[in-house]
From Swiss-Prot:
GO terms for molecular function: DNA binding; excinuclease ABC activity. The gene is uvrC. It comes from Methanosarcina mazei (strain ATCC BAA-159 / DSM 3647 / Goe1 / Go1 / JCM 11833 / OCM 88). This is UvrABC system protein C. Residues 15-93 form the GIY-YIG domain. The UvrABC repair system catalyzes the recognition and processing of DNA lesions. UvrC both incises the 5' and 3' sides of the lesion. The N-terminal half is responsible for the 3' incision and the C-terminal half is responsible for the 5' incision. It comes from the Archaea. It is found in: Cytoplasm. Belongs to the UvrC family. Interacts with UvrB in an incision complex. The lineage of its organism: Archaea, Methanobacteriati, Methanobacteriota, Stenosarchaea group, Methanomicrobia. PANTHER family: UVRABC SYSTEM PROTEIN C (PTHR30562:SF1), UVRC/OXIDOREDUCTASE (PTHR30562).
Length: 523
């Protein structure tokens, strides 16, 4: 049963297993959790005073509570994952790596388009999810190119660039009939379902018939399609022979963040490595494992640095369909593997820490700038002016949080006004959504661009350290000082700022180029 209230009524909670949902004043779900004892677990939020930053922020905005009772704790695990997927609460761990497990979607339109989809909802057919993003993307490209399927969201009134380079069959200009396109889609579905050998045999027969009729151009097209499919079949067969029998997981908690790495080992050989960064919170390991193994098949054996709750082990067995061995080794080969993962966490995540520490020192920042956002403006003679924002997290690009901005309020060339607009839009949105601010903001430009951005932050009452970097001599400016900071351009801190600035510039240029190509096609 469930129960909700504008006030959080702890007395209404039972001593039973289930899930609880914290909500804000508008009823939006902020966090979903599971508990062996709902009353004890939820009450603990109000009894503790030394919360971690994430939980403290959650309790600041929590205004309501719902709960759902389950029969067992394993049922609570399953329900928790379902509720997280439904509500996408911002205080739950959202695995950045989740896009690796997207599906390939053929839509249900008259002329179906092919796309990558993270959720298998909507009309059409879904294939996947794929554990390997590389395999998924390769299959997607082979199918798209081989069968010349459309990818556009809305069919344009005239042929696009993809049609002119032979990558699309052009249903938008009636270059292909519904029946002909339908045949292409049928072949694509056959490939995506794994029936590649049957399709190749059928196409080989068709190719011979074309050649016998002296339809050599069509026969050559089929030959190329067959070659692509044969390579795909070989590649897929190799992938499907892999069976991971051990997952080894380790992590480091630092600066209220969890830096976690997962190794997949098959017969002593490392086959895959994945890393994740998310905010530290109580029961973070349990929350991570539930989310990750709800999307991925649990291994025969899971090697971890600390014991897992019995109900979590039962959950893993439920997902896999048989018992999952959980090892917490203290010595021997498995302990060496666990230490190896930890060493990789240290090197992989904190090899960049020296750059962050150098930046903190040179800029006299109050804390390590774990989250850095950088803005750049790009334009071509005042047309197609765009803004870009890149985010670096833990010293690395976090492309999931990159943002693009079409400049709306500025006419002609005005970098000062343009940078003001994108800064205003970015941080007013974060304030509105009650999201955390970055630790440092970087502006690509000199004192003028810096001043424009800083004024917008002041208007919004956003207190985040901000700097700018001028291109000529790579000079770094801060608000209130006429002269640049005494940081040499070949110092570690400056080189790191240049790296971030260059990434923002690259991202803006690519967006600018995309908009100009679209404009040319529409002419």
């Amino acid at each position: 049963m469930g129960r909700g209230s504008k006030m959080i009524d702890l007395e209404a909670l039972p001593h039973l297993p289930g899930c609880y949902l914290f909500k804000d004043e508008e009823g939006i779900v902020l966090y979903v959790g599971k508990a062996k004892d709902l009353k004890k677990r939820v009450s603990s939020y109000f009894q503790k005073r030394d919360h971690d930053p994430k939980t403290a922020s959650l309790m600041q905005f929590a205004r309501g509570l719902d709960f759902i009772v389950t029969n067992t704790e394993v049922e609570a695990f399953l329900l928790e994952n379902t509720l997280i997927k439904k509500h996408w609460p911002r205080y739950n761990i959202m695995l950045k790596d989740s896009k690796r497990y997207a599906c390939i979607h053929l839509t249900g339109e008259k002329f179906p388009r092919i796309r990558i989809a993270r959720k298998n909802t909507g009309e059409g057919e879904f294939f996947g999810p794929f554990v390997s993003a590389r395999e998924r993307d390769y299959i997607f490209e082979v199918v798209r190119k081989t069968f010349q399927l459309r990818t556009c969201r809305k069919m344009p009134s005239r042929a696009c660039l993809r049609y002119h380079i032979g990558a699309c069959s052009g249903p938008c200009i009636s270059s292909v009939s519904v029946e002909e396109y339908g045949e292409k889609v049928k072949k694509a579905i056959s490939v995506l379902k794994g029936n590649i050998r049957e399709l190749i045999e059928s196409m080989e027969t068709e190719m011979k018939e074309m050649a016998a009729k002296q339809m050599f151009e069509q026969a050559m097209e089929l030959r190329d399609e067959i070659a692509a499919l044969e390579y795909l079949q070989e590649k897929q067969n190799m992938e499907r022979q892999k069976k991971y029998d051990e997952d080894i997981l380790n992590y480091i908690v630092r600066d209220n963040n969890v830096y976690l790495m997962l190794f997949k080992v098959y017969k002593g050989t490392l086959e895959d490595k994945q890393d994740f960064v998310f905010a530290f919170g109580e029961d973070f390991l349990e929350e991570f494992l539930v989310q990750y193994y709800s999307e991925n098949d649990p291994p025969e054996e899971l090697i971890v640095p600390e014991p897992l709750d019995e109900s979590l082990v039962e959950f893993l067995a439920h997902v896999k369909g048989k018992k999952v061995k959980v090892a917490v080794p203290k010595q021997g080969d498995k302990k060496e593997l666990l230490d190896l993962v930890l060493k990789n966490v240290e090197i992989g995540f904190f090899g960049d820490r020296k750059k962050l520490e150098a930046l903190q020192s040179k800029l006299s920042l109050p804390k390590i700038p774990n989250v850095i956002e950088c803005f750049d403006i790009s334009h071509l003679s005042g047309t197609a002016t765009v803004g870009s924002m890149v985010q670096f997290r833990g010293g690395r690009p976090d492309k999931h949080n990159y943002r693009r901005f079409k400049i709306e309020s500025v006419e002609g060339i005005d970098d000062f006004a343009s940078i003001a607009e994108v800064v205003r839009r970015r941080y007013s949105r974060l304030l509105e959504d009650k999201h955390e601010m970055p630790d440092l903001i970087i502006i690509d430009g000199g004192k003028g661009q810096l001043s424009s951005a800083f004024q917008e932050l002041r208007k919004l009452r956003v207190k985040v350290p901000i700097i700018s970097i001028a291109k000529r001599e790579e000079e770094i400016y801060v608000p209130g000082l006429k002269s640049p900071l005494p940081i040499k351009k070949d110092e570690k801190a400056s080189l790191f700022v240049q790296e971030i600035r260059d990434e923002a510039h690259r991202f803006a240029i690519n967006y600018n180029r995309l908009l100009r190509q679209k404009a040319l096609i529409q002419k």
